[in-house]
Amino acid sequence: MEEILKEQNLELGGIQVHYKEAAPAGRQAGQGDALLILHGWGASSESWVLLQRQLCKEGYRVITIDLPGFGRSNSPATVWGVQDYSNFIEQFVQAIGIRQFFLLGHSFGGQIAISFTVQHQELVKKLILCAPAGIRRPPGAREKLLFVFSKILTLVFLAVPSQSLKNRFRAAAYRLMRRSDYFKAEGVMREVMRRVIREDLFSVFSQIRVPTLVVWGDDDRLVPVEDAYVLVREIPHSAVEIISGAGHVPHLKTPEKLSQLVTKFLKA
């Protein structure tokens, strides 16, 4: 089945938003079961084009969005949290005329998808969570040691006169803490990241009532695969699929396998 991929823009709450919509050829705009995909931190709709096309061939209207602050969408004017992004998604689906839809969220996008679904279960027909963030753990010994070391590096760079050397020390400190995304973020988005990584959604998992598929790569080094089993234990109508050989981005590493799992779940 051939598909048509369109890139579009709209303004919501003063923010210019970019999104992509793929629909099977010959189908009128707005027709067909819709699937909305929310990307992870530091990514954009572009990273989902391959999977978007594959799922479109299965007959779905697939929409990927550049969340505010990513890709070609403007950043929010204030420091947003997960709730703000969830509210934004509500405005977005209303603006493009989706009443009920399937929802897929990856990593940070999974955090948003969880928050949105809990509050709008009447809108979400089925939920796919791909290595979602949202579970906070107390730091272990390694993390505590790295935190202390990163603080030392930060103090060292303050005493260095060269700006280029300062940047190197700062980058090293954030990388040690696995916060290179924070280092790369600019302006308000740095504070957005600081806010969202502190948000723990564990207490709301059990409130999800829609059928849910949890997908994880067994080689995920960013969000531990053990979290998958926490989710399926807490979410009433959920199942888990672990993709062998995939890391944190199965939509890029193993797109065919992810497409098969998603399609099977949506058609069940």
Predicted ranges, named:
Residues 208, 214-216, 220:
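Short beta-strand/loop motif that positions the catalytic acidic residue
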Residues 221-227:
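Conserved alpha/beta-hydrolase "acid-adjacent" motif
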